Regions:
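Phosphate/nucleotide-binding beta-alpha loop and adjacent structural elements of enzyme active sites
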Residues: 1-168
Length: 168
């Protein structure tokens, strides 16, 4: 009820743009888990009640929405969140201040890749073929950007705290 009332009061542009007001502030997911396919549920079974740990989330997307690591962050874990979407780390800095939040692209070698951005940011990616297949009447590529990508080992060499082990 509150969500529908707010939707009537807040201009449409805030509901339809990537990183919109809705996704940032109102989309509180049911239950304690956040991932899209239950990855955090499976990981919680592996790590049990462990209240400290370290994760690396490549393609982190959002600190809560479809997040594989939000559940663990709320338990006291820390980690590195990596996402290529320009501007994506602003919301991570707000909701995940204990984490290392990096707006970077990951690739098998240092190279420039074309990043395909959709009106639904969960669909963003680097594959032209997959991006073209994902386009529908609802989901559209809104922009492309050439982004310098780095191997994960280079990113970890530069940003992983000295002596820090990675749980997942």
């Amino acid at each position: 009820m509150i969500k529908s009332l707010l939707k009537k009061l807040i201009p449409t542009k805030y509901w339809e743009t990537p990183g919109s007001f809705y996704h940032l502030y109102l989309n509180n997911h049911a239950g304690s888990y956040y991932s899209q396919e239950g990855e955090d549920i499976l990981l919680s079974r592996i790590f049990g009640e462990q209240t400290e740990g370290f994760y690396v989330d490549v393609g982190a997307h959002h600190p809560r929405r479809f997040s594989n690591t939000c559940f663990f962050y709320k338990r006291g874990w820390r980690g590195i969140n990596i996402d290529a979407l320009p501007g994506s780390m602003k919301v991570f800095q707000k909701f995940r201040p204990r984490d290392i939040n990096l707006e970077l692209a990951v690739s098998e070698r240092e190279q420039v890749l074309t990043y395909y951005m959709f009106n639904e940011p969960a669909l963003n990616g680097f594959s032209k073929t997959i991006s073209e297949k994902r386009q529908t009447d609802v989901y559209k590529i809104t922009n492309t950007k050439d982004i310098l990508a780095f191997p994960l080992y280079t990113i970890l060499d530069n940003h992983l705290p000295l002596g820090q082990s990675i749980d997942f």
